[in-house]
Amino acid sequence: MRSAFAPLSLMFRSAPLALALAVAGLSGSALAAPKADIQALAQKHQQPLLDTLRDLVHIESGSKDMEGVEQIANYVAGKLREQGGKVEILQPTDVYRLGDTPEKIGPMVHAEFKGKGSSRIMLIAHMDTVYLRGMLKDQPFRIDGERAYGLGIADDKQGVALILHTVAMLRQLGFDNYGTLTVLMNSDEEISSPGARSTITRMGAEQDAVFSFEGGGTDGGVRLATSGIGAAYLKVEGKASHAGAKPEDGVNALYELSHQLLQMKDLSKPETGLKLNWTVAKAGTNRNVIPAEATAQADARALRVADFTALEQAMQAKVGHKLLDASKVQLKFEVRRPPLEANEASRSLAKQAQTIYSDELGLKMSVMEKATGGGTDAAFAALKAKGAVIEGFGLSGYGAHSNDAEYVQLNTIVPRLYLATRMIMDLSK
């Protein structure tokens, strides 16, 4: 069987799209019942995975909680070392500072497993949560029926646990036909990954396939596209003066800000998914003082990476056309998270995942090509990627970022372990 897949590895290195199409075709011609050894092992890992989830949930790891993110990074690194990986804890060095980026950013865990093949595969998830220290008491780990509840359990500690146990399953199966299996987990995803984004992009560019383990939603689907998130900050400097006695001596920053906002009101392009909406504005200190400063913030969304670049260029051109020559206008544009764009390589691998789910497990899996909701780190992995990038390999669940209802569905543990293991094995041949 390995000889039949040997040319596939060569194709994967030179032409990821051709490889993805070939893999999809091969999977369609080899439909079978579940692989008994993989299924049995996945079932054996259900309780250990829940034990891992309990440990992860009980580590409070908010993005800005350095003690917590360092603790969870050490825990994850230890688990990966147990599986024989070359593991390092990386401190971010190339930081993309956003308006709300904290001074100190948490670490990444990077592990590499070398095999005897040639395919390069990467698994990603994030260890941080949106929650503050002390909130664990309100959402401790617990199991109620077919659901496991806990702080950050769906977003994204289930993804961390799935990767750890997928790696363990591969080792127990004695499988190492890949070239390299890379694991990368960061602890700043919930604050737009300012420290990890460059590393994710660099490593993503080296891979033949990247699987991201954010949750599979309520229906267990995988995602090929996510929306990009941007932000614009406009600052106008004028000159204060008495609004009643000498208004002509001032430079009204509010007038200039209003002019700027109005001339940018038509930059949205709904037909392509580009949206720009000004949402916050502030000016002045007192009713009787001409405002010397005015600021505004905008939310931007895009479905294509190039649209953010074009939008920023258009906005910068607009601010040069001022109402008041004496005013100073500054515009800062942030790409908080780029969009993930579907391509043929990701479509083909997603089809393969669907085939495994339907023909081997008797389960349905949706593939979402239209971006919905927030962005994820999969988009950073895809920025310079040559191969497929697929989001949503995690457990089904609900309630991310909620106060008391975050959970994952227990009946998705075995299928997701099976799927991740099968996909890695198929792509490694």
Where are these regions (language model features)?
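Short, solvent-exposed loop/turn segments at the edges of secondary structure
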Residues: 104-106, 206, 227-229, 291-293
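Acidic/His- and Gly-rich active-site-bordering loop/insert found
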Residues: 33-151, 169-173, 177
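Acidic/histidine-rich catalytic neighborhood of metal-dependent amide-processing enzymes
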Residues: 152, 156-229, 269, 428-429
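Bacterial N-terminal signal peptides that target proteins for export
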Residues: 1-18
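Acidic, glycine-rich active-site loops and adjacent beta-strand->loop/helix elements
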Residues: 127-129, 184-191, 215-217, 240, ...
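Soluble non-cytosolic domains of exported or imported proteins
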Residues: 43-47, 63-71, 154-157, 161, ...
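Metal-dependent amide/peptide-bond hydrolase catalytic core
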Residues: 33-37, 79, 84, 215-216, ...
